[in-house]
């Protein structure tokens, strides 16, 4: 029994705005089914005596302080913006 259906694959492809053929949907269904099957095998691993791991190595990122600096004057920004109105840069709409 498949753990994922062709309809689910097509639905996810639609949500991702991907155009896939029926053959591709069938291929992805088989591939995703094998991936899910492998992930389910991990549930069978005995982890009773295993400490939870948050990081593989005992390292941590060293980052600089996040300090706000002086930005560009609004006038300079607007000079370089191809389209602006009332102190705001206008950009083309990307949402329907």
Swiss-Prot record:
Its EC number is 6.3.5.-. Belongs to the GatC family. InterPro entries: Asp/Glu-ADT_sf_sub_c, GatC. GO terms for biological process: glutaminyl-tRNAGln biosynthesis via transamidation; regulation of translational fidelity; translation. One of its GO terms (molecular function) is glutaminyl-tRNA synthase (glutamine-hydrolyzing) activity. It is an enzyme of class 6 (ligase). Disulfide bonds: none annotated. Heterotrimer of A, B and C subunits. Keywords: ATP-binding, Ligase, Nucleotide-binding, Protein biosynthesis. HAMAP family: GatC. SUPFAM superfamilies: Glu-tRNAGln amidotransferase C subunit (SSF141000). It catalyses: L-glutamyl-tRNA(Gln) + L-glutamine + ATP + H2O = L-glutaminyl-tRNA(Gln) + L-glutamate + ADP + phosphate + H(+); L-aspartyl-tRNA(Asn) + L-glutamine + ATP + H2O = L-asparaginyl-tRNA(Asn) + L-glutamate + ADP + phosphate + 2 H(+). This is Aspartyl/glutamyl-tRNA(Asn/Gln) amidotransferase subunit C. NCBIfam families: gatC. It comes from the Bacteria. Allows the formation of correctly charged Asn-tRNA(Asn) or Gln-tRNA(Gln) through the transamidation of misacylated Asp-tRNA(Asn) or Glu-tRNA(Gln) in organisms which lack either or both of asparaginyl-tRNA or glutaminyl-tRNA synthetases. The reaction takes place in the presence of glutamine and ATP through an activated phospho-Asp-tRNA(Asn) or phospho-Glu-tRNA(Gln).
